[in-house]
């Protein structure tokens, strides 16, 4: 039974989607004015794994993720670079999508942009005005928070606390400090659109309410994002959406923990961030995924080079296991009998699979699931060391388990993809080069033999000489 931690209820709940077999999921996308960093990667890798696991369990998942392509930050950056705000946003949307593809994050089904939904936003604001939740001030349209009695149910924030010590700044047209903008009237030199309230642009919070509801309906299953969005963004989304629709809007709210740097949140404002592109120059994409998955998605994740190196080493351990299996399968025994060693190893594989699912069913606990993965890897390596003639059936059982891990975690994908004809052909070529090198060594033409070894190593193939015999395995760089 899958349980998820719901930020709305502050507890783990049995996951029951609104429609059996189908999950509708919205994840807040980036405001596109700069290069995405590891904090973004953490959130989107986490929700990618959540989506993958739901699909693995048989759910049909419809996933929507927006792009905020008009915002104060975009306008400010465009002024600094001399670009048109729309062009700047499109440039960083392209960069974001390239980075996600590199990290093997599956694309969302729909990527709505704010600027393509201005008419929908205006219509939504109009409904809030008609229902008495919104009013027009001198500089825009505002949502009147006190009209929504359940305000604060997600974050625990109380209206009276927002009012303490707060004041309406001169020039602001809102009635109360806690009210928030739905529509901002145009300022000189800023992008603007026509509306019944004059030219202007949307407020931030209204955008996600409109785009999620347009594609997923007035009620859907999962709304996700980083912890920093709980208040005010998601709190305000709930207020305006449930005020408009008159019923519960989202069933489960999921939030990822912060990436930390020396005890502080990684953020652009603090300048302590590392971009995804910088990381990809030093580490394979799977290493970054593995680094993220070693912690539960709700826990803080401390960024250190040592942590990434540790993730790389652990990932290499698993790749070594997979390669050991691959090598052993070339000479494995097809047998209808098992001995004590086979039964013992099979039990560890079976128990590892159970523990893996148990961990993932416990609010997508990837950290615990990985422990099960390493238990199986250790058992297989021990089996290969102790077995006189490894049994093919045991090795296939192990590969079946690792393929599940691959599907859910988004790692080893190239490895399993290469089980096709392409992999077989590449293996034949490698075997041929190994035989050629063997002959060169016999003829004492060591310079050429060493050249083959080094060239194969550059391609991720490591040769190991044991006397007159040579074995090979794949490595990650």
Curated annotation (Swiss-Prot):
Residue span of motif 'KMSKS' region: 265-269
Enzyme class: ligase
Binding site for Zn(2+): 28, 208, 233, 237
Annotated compartments: Cytoplasm
Molecular-function GO term, any one: ATP binding
Placement of sequence motif 'HIGH' region: 30-40
Annotated cofactor note: Binds 1 zinc ion per subunit.
Cofactor: Zn(2+)
GO CC terms, sorted: cytoplasm
EC number from the UniProt entry: 6.1.1.16
Chief localisation class: cytoplasm
SUPFAM superfamilies xref list: Anticodon-binding domain of a subclass of class I aminoacyl-tRNA synthetases, Nucleotidylyl transferase
Family in the record: Belongs to the class-I aminoacyl-tRNA synthetase family.
Name of the protein in its database record: Cysteine--tRNA ligase
Organism: Pyrococcus furiosus (strain ATCC 43587 / DSM 3638 / JCM 8422 / Vc1)
Gene: cysS
